[in-house]
Design a protein with these regions (language model features):
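N-terminal subdomain of nucleotide-sugar transferases
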Residues: 1-44, 81, 109
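Short, flexible loop segments at the rims of nucleotide/cofactor-binding pockets, characterized by
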Residues: 59-65, 126-133
């Protein structure tokens, strides 16, 4: 089994800067075979400008570029049913392409999917409630529940 790691973009003021390093060290220590799926940052500032948890533009840009790379790997047959895709955050721009692709792919190319739910609409104290985003976020969460082979952590 190989883990395809979908990490978060690095921000100076958040734990995300260290998160990929911590994860890679843990995988190496345990002898886990893994691939870091790369994304492209919108700029080099590593700052949160719009939003309060992650930068709204930066998260969207990084997540979509990362998903484009994941889709290329899936199309090339690099990811199989024996593998896992681990998303560091349940909210990942481009996530709707997963059920779209997986439900039309042969079983042999349907990996296990792991999504880390850090808060989202299920948490009444999450920022999505403050910014009026709870309705669409809860619908997004329902979509995530329908992804084949999904496990929400």
């Amino acid at each position: 089994m190989k883990i395809f790691y979908m990490g978060l973009e690095p921000y100076e003021g958040r734990y995300t800067l260290q998160l990929q390093d911590w994860t890679e060290r843990a995988y190496k220590k345990r002898g886990v075979e893994y691939v870091v799926v790369p994304g492209t940052t919108i700029d080099d500032s590593k700052a949160i400008v719009t939003g309060q948890v992650l930068d709204a533009h930066g998260r969207s840009y990084f997540g979509m570029s990362q998903f484009m790379n994941l889709v290329q790997m899936m199309k090339a047959g690099e990811i199989t049913k024996d593998d896992a895709i681990f998303f560091e955050d349940m909210f990942q721009p481009g996530m709707e392409s997963l059920p779209y692709i997986l439900m039309q792919s042969p079983e042999e190319y349907r990996p296990k999917i792991y999504l880390r739910c850090l808060a989202q609409a299920v948490d009444p104290d999450d920022f999505v409630h403050v910014w009026g985003m709870a309705k669409w976020m809860s619908l997004y969460e329902q979509m995530c529940n329908e992804i084949p082979n999904v496990n929400i952590l």
